[in-house]
Design a protein with these regions (language model features):
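Bacterial N-terminal signal peptides
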Residues: 7-18
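Positively charged n-region of N-terminal signal peptides that target proteins for export
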Residues: 1-4
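Short, surface-exposed polybasic-aromatic patches that bind anionic ligands, especially phosphate groups
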Residues: 26-360
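Signal peptide processing junction and immediate N-terminal pro/mature segment
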Residues: 18-26
């Protein structure tokens, strides 16, 4: 449900619904969801950009388009301010299970293509998870990038000679996540694929997900997405245009090596056999502590750290501990040395306030 926005002061959105998640038994008085009005103002003031063909994400044209794209409504979990949310009672133990002394890091992994509203749709053969996939056809462009393209390949001497078509067809290995992401801003649709691969007879993938960017609707309970938690990926990555602007106004995603056999809103799926309550669930939300001093970091890293204080980051998949997702855009500077100064102990796990009702 799209709601009216109040832009004169901090945007407040009152939502009603029946998805109470872990709030059962708590005080159910109404909680007012908060979102940043500057985000809405930025989107509304952006000059509309014509999209006449597929636009690679790592271009100035894509930067201009993304400035005016609203990835889900203002009251969506990705766009909700959580600075005042309470700390989870088991926060310390969950932090320790991941590694309190381990550094924050990132994978320069995710890539996407922006397509026009009339992009030709093609079939994608879904193999591993057809019962938890959305049906096609899909507007997959010929130049859709596969996870890691281009930066992860161009910065590796052993992979530098590979072309996009090589990567689309499975080089250097099919044994990888190979996420493929397609954004259709005009129709407000997001298409995400797990292990997307081009073959002589068309495209294949192990899973396909379609998200309505005008809606807060989740995937069906128990369903995966191209991410293990059942969440979308594109709203969660750090992009070049955001680093250049100096503001990231959404939550981020990260991975942990060991997660629990459970999920919490807004996740819909788990990917573990472990039941230890000290392990984080898929969808667990972490926030950088308010007292963490960001003043000595570069402008780009400050924008990431401020976002982690204001919006936090969700456990979205299994992988390297404390690893966020940054776009595989070779315009993004190397940030590893700075981010490694942030440790697991600088975070806290948060939980939704009493009376919070997930938006529909």
């Amino acid at each position: 449900m799209r709601l009216a926005f109040i832009e004169a002061c901090l945007l407040t959105v009152i939502v009603l619904g029946d998805r109470s998640g872990e709030l059962r038994g708590q005080d159910q008085s109404q909680y007012v969801i908060q979102s940043d009005p500057a985000r809405i103002a930025r989107i509304k003031s952006a000059r509309p950009q014509p999209i006449t063909g597929p636009v690679p994400y790592n271009t100035p044209a894509a930067d201009a388009i993304m400035a005016g794209v609203e990835l889900f409504p203002a009251d969506n979990p990705w766009n909700t301010l959580i600075e005042d949310w309470p700390v989870h009672p088991n926060s310390r133990r969950m932090i320790e299970s991941i590694g309190a002394t381990k550094p924050l890091r990132y994978n320069q992994d995710m890539a996407f293509v922006i397509v026009p509203p009339d992009q030709r749709k093609v079939e994608v053969k879904i193999s591993a998870y057809p019962d938890e996939s959305d049906r096609g056809p899909f507007p997959v462009a010929d130049n859709v990038p596969i996870e890691g393209w281009p930066a992860s390949f161009r910065r590796d001497p052993a992979l530098r000679a590979l072309t996009l078509q090589d990567v689309q067809r499975g080089k250097p290995s099919l044994d990888a996540d190979r996420h493929g992401i397609v954004l259709d801003p005009a129709n407000r649709r997001l298409y995400e694929f797990y292990r997307l691969t081009r073959t002589d007879v068309g495209w294949t993938a192990e899973q396909s997900s379609v998200f309505d960017l005008a809606s807060n609707k989740l995937r069906p309970d128990g369903w995966t997405s191209s991410d293990a938690a059942g969440l979308p990926i594109l709203p969660a990555i750090v992009r070049h245009d955001e680093l250049k602007r100096g503001v990231i106004d959404h939550a981020l995603r990260f991975t942990v090596r060991r997660s629990r056999r459970a999920y919490v809103y807004p996740a819909t799926h788990f990917a573990s056999r472990l039941t230890d309550e000290n392990l984080p669930r898929m969808g667990e939300r972490f926030r950088l502590r308010k007292d963490f001093d960001t003043s000595s970091f570069s402008r780009e890293v400050q924008s990431i750290l401020v976002a982690l204080k204001r919006y936090g980051m969700f456990v979205a998949d299994n992988g390297l501990d404390w690893a966020m997702s940054v776009s595989a855009d070779d315009r993004v500077p190397v940030l590893h040395d700075e981010l490694r100064r942030v440790k697991g102990s600088d975070f806290e796990v948060v939980t939704a306030p009493a009376g919070y009702v997930p938006p529909r």
